[in-house]
Amino acid sequence: MTKTFKKFSIAGLALLFMATAAFAGWSTKASAADMRSLTAAQITAEMGAGWNLGNQLEATVNGTPNETSWGNPTITPELIKKVKAAGFKTIRIPVSYLNYIGSAPNYTVNASWLNRIQQVVDYAYNEGLYVVINMHGDGFHSIPGSWLHVNSSNQNVIRDKYQKVWQQVATRFSAYNERLIFESMNEVFDGNYNNPNTSYYGNLNAYNQIFVDTVRKTGGNNNARWLLVPGWNTNIDYTVGNYGFVVPTDNFRSSAIPSSQKRIMISAHYYSPWDFAGEENGNITQWGATATNPAKRSTWGQEDYLDSQFKSMYDKFVTQGYPVVMGEFGSIDKSSYDSSNNNYRAVYAKAVTATAKKYKLVPVYWDNGFNGQHGFALFNRFNNTVTQQNIINAIMQGMQ
């Protein structure tokens, strides 16, 4: 997601390279012996409620990733420890590559950037958390240097580049166990919000298939790793409906996996109703049956809609053995317009997580690190403190 962020003119690329210079040669002690073969139900239960380390490793300056360029400080182990202590079991780490990808034909990813990604992964992985890493801003039309475009005429070049980048990333992490999950992409679509173009959707499906095949062929634990793939723009309706989504085949996975079990997960995001969750104004500040002011409550997207959306993912995928990860959900702070807003944000968060648990989905809260008006943050990343304990409590209550 890049819908809500604040950019500040602070630490530049020189600072990033100073920070990452010490990470060269960073390695992990993970081994193939660590890999557990979990069923869909088991891994969903273990992943619990998740949290996004948003607007950091996907943040960019003119197409070059820079983790502090959107106003957040350098990521520290202390932040991750605080997130774990709050009760979260999974951390999703959005990652952009963009200008850190070299030229054809090798498309070599900058080594210092890979080292930094690995170090941040290890902050969470070494705490016993589940970790999800993806390819995030590379597919956003609005990001300078983005290239993973379903509506581009240059699909052969895109697919070759995509395959080679994921090959490098997967190889780097091939020894990590089942607690590391790769996600093929983020909110990829053609840039307009009409129904999906069938041809473009076919390109998205091709990316997902390339991703699965490439990761599996890198060996190590990757032939049995859980892999996460989205449909069009991570939209639930466009993923479950008759719009063209195809679950990738998994022909190169380990033969040790029981044939009745899957190792593919499906990704979707939930920000409905958007006028409550994301619009940066004070028009809609309340949500749900307990709203006290009908004029401040959206005319759609309430409890019944939430239930029907998550049930559709359950019916389409969970019943067939595919875990579903709601990789982003949340609502921005509008308390400057309505002092009761944070209470309704908590009501919303609890409803989303409780409904996810009801339908055996994994809910992952979107935190962009920004506190205050229009921010999604639950934590202050500068001093590693909790800023929205009521929303965290609501999330954890929803998972009970």
UniProtKB/Swiss-Prot annotation:
Report if keyword Nucleotide-binding is assigned. Answer: no
Q: Would the keyword Lyase turn up in this protein's UniProt record?
A: no
GO cellular component labels:
cell surface; extracellular region
As for subcellular location, the record says: Secreted
Activity regulation note: Strongly inhibited by Hg(2+), Ag(+) and Fe(3+). To a lesser extent, is also inhibited by Pb(2+), Mn(2+), Sn(2+) and Cu(2+). By contrast, Ni(2+), Zn(2+), Co(2+), Ba(2+) and NH(4)(+) do not affect enzyme activity, while 10 mM Ca(2+), and Mg(2+) produce a stimulating effect. Is also strongly inhibited by chemicals such as N-bromosuccinimide and dimethyl(2-dihydroxy-5-nitrobenzyl)sulphonium bromide. Is not affected by N-acetylimidazole.
**Catalytic activity field:** Endohydrolysis of (1->4)-beta-D-glucosidic linkages in cellulose, lichenin and cereal beta-D-glucans
Matching PANTHER family, A to Z?
ENDOGLUCANASE, PUTATIVE (AFU_ORTHOLOGUE AFUA_5G01830)-RELATED, GLUCAN ENDO-1,6-BETA-GLUCOSIDASE B
Q: What is the protein's name according to its record?
A: Endoglucanase A
Q: What is the lineage of its organism?
A: Bacteria, Bacillati, Bacillota, Bacilli, Bacillales
Corresponding gene? Answer: celA
